[in-house]
């Protein structure tokens, strides 16, 4: 059984799954949740990832990072990044044209790249899988939106590397959902529309599935529409209501906003199954309690335009794939936001009453498919995966600039990848000594409106009239969507090439290695912290336990002995209260001192047969402190 997993790295939540014995397991995290918030929190003492980070976001907004997926592989001055910055409670800074997140961590200011933040979330998913499978997990298939361009895909791959994962492949989320769905669909050709409305992004894809072969026909979407936008509508609605009722504006207070947002997210989820729900937040702002309620109808009205706008990309993919909506055989809903009844109704009505499929949990479908793909790539011999072949597509057209700034496409969008295309070009002027090959991605006719991926020079062309030299340009896109462009002058055989992993966005090998080392360091610190806490808990538990045992010992011990142990135990408890941040060694030393006083006296009690069963916790009698893993309480304090 392979230990390869599928990871859905989402904007707001992530999910990990594993395929074995012909079935997929969605793996729950240490909190028992099948999805984990894509949040990382930094405090004075530790780094938190997932639920723990999200739960403290209200108290620590400036140092709790989320939505890293909106930043990954982008430039700082990208309009999307600039727009998002206004809404982030944490600070973004410009480092060599790339966004980095600045936080206070353990008393110092630290900068992290979006890749590092995503790698922490991926690391958390890796640990979740490891504790469930009871073995190391190295290989993973990680998913990205169909819309992600080259540098975003590459940056996601880098994040996996930093987390210590070997990323077998980056696959499109809708493709993954289709695999989850298509495993058992063998036979005639079917057109499947994947409608994926997640926490932060919206993607629609049209696939054809035939004999286990998947082909993506078209993709469209909105990188900025999802559950968070519906939460925002609720948040704004309640800010206005609070203003009306209390004549106060709470939108200036980050903590109040965060608490309100958490309540709104909860209310939204409740409204998917109930017609109305109440929102109750004690002391929300300036000591004022906020108690109110909201109905499903009001929520639908607040988000009406957003819900309606989800149909535009649906129309676009049908146009691109040249299909009528009646030719769509199956509709698959993916992403937690498709649980909203109004969204389901809009989709059903658009397809003239055709019911969408919901057999797979919408927020788990992508990880499910990624796990199947991981099993295939690591050679799982299951009959279920035997005949499955995956064809992905290039999300945007790829081409080069020709005379007059024209975009000449070599690979049109929605081409199946991996793919390779060649075309012959020539010089534009007589005796031109070289050509500049500029590679663009995008759909516009002029290159200035498209996205420059990279460029290189092919020089040393022998003097000749214009149009005579033959320069063959080859575009080769591999299965991860990474592009190699080469050019050869046929007369001389001179050639040059470029691998486009979007250099501007690409982390260098050194950067990645540095970040991998840093990730290891953080992991060690996290482990150190949990060992420190274990020692502290153990000391506390033993001190209290001794106190209790002594108070119940009655006349089996002399008063002086009882006093000695009680006094030492109380001293220890007092010391604990005033030294919560002590090191593991200090806790262990205190335990030694406590045992030096208590052990001889406790031995007397045992000989007198006085200690109740299990009263004396680990290490009695016996001098050395036991290993904290083995002893001490195994439950954690909850907030």
From Swiss-Prot:
It is found in: Cytoplasm; Secreted, Cell wall. One of its GO terms (molecular function) is tRNA binding. The modification Phosphoserine is found at residues 20, 551, 603. Signal peptide: none annotated. There is a cross-link at residue 556 (Glycyl lysine isopeptide (Lys-Gly) (interchain with G-Cter in ubiquitin)). It comes from the Eukaryota. Its main location: cytoplasm. The keyword Acetylation applies. Coiled coil: none annotated. GO terms for cellular component: cytoplasm; cytosol; extracellular vesicle; fungal-type cell wall; fungal-type vacuole membrane; mitochondrion; nucleus; plasma membrane. PROSITE patterns: HSP70_1 (PS00297), HSP70_2 (PS00329), HSP70_3 (PS01036). One of its GO terms (biological process) is response to oxygen levels. Residues 605-639 are annotated as: Disordered. The modification N-acetylserine is found at residue 2. Keywords: Acetylation, ATP-binding, Cell wall, Cytoplasm, Isopeptide bond, Nucleotide-binding, Phosphoprotein, Secreted, Stress response, Ubl conjugation. Belongs to the heat shock protein 70 family. Present with 364000 molecules/cell in log phase SD medium. PANTHER family: HEAT SHOCK PROTEIN 70KDA (PTHR19375). May play a role in the transport of polypeptides both across the mitochondrial membranes and into the endoplasmic reticulum. A functional difference between SSA1 and SSA2 proteins is expected. SSA2 can participate in the ATP-dependent disassembly of clathrin-coated vesicles. Binds human HTN3/histatin-5, a peptide from saliva, and mediates its fungicidal activity. Interacts with NAP1. This is Heat shock protein SSA2. It comes from Saccharomyces cerevisiae (strain ATCC 204508 / S288c) (Baker's yeast). The gene is SSA2.
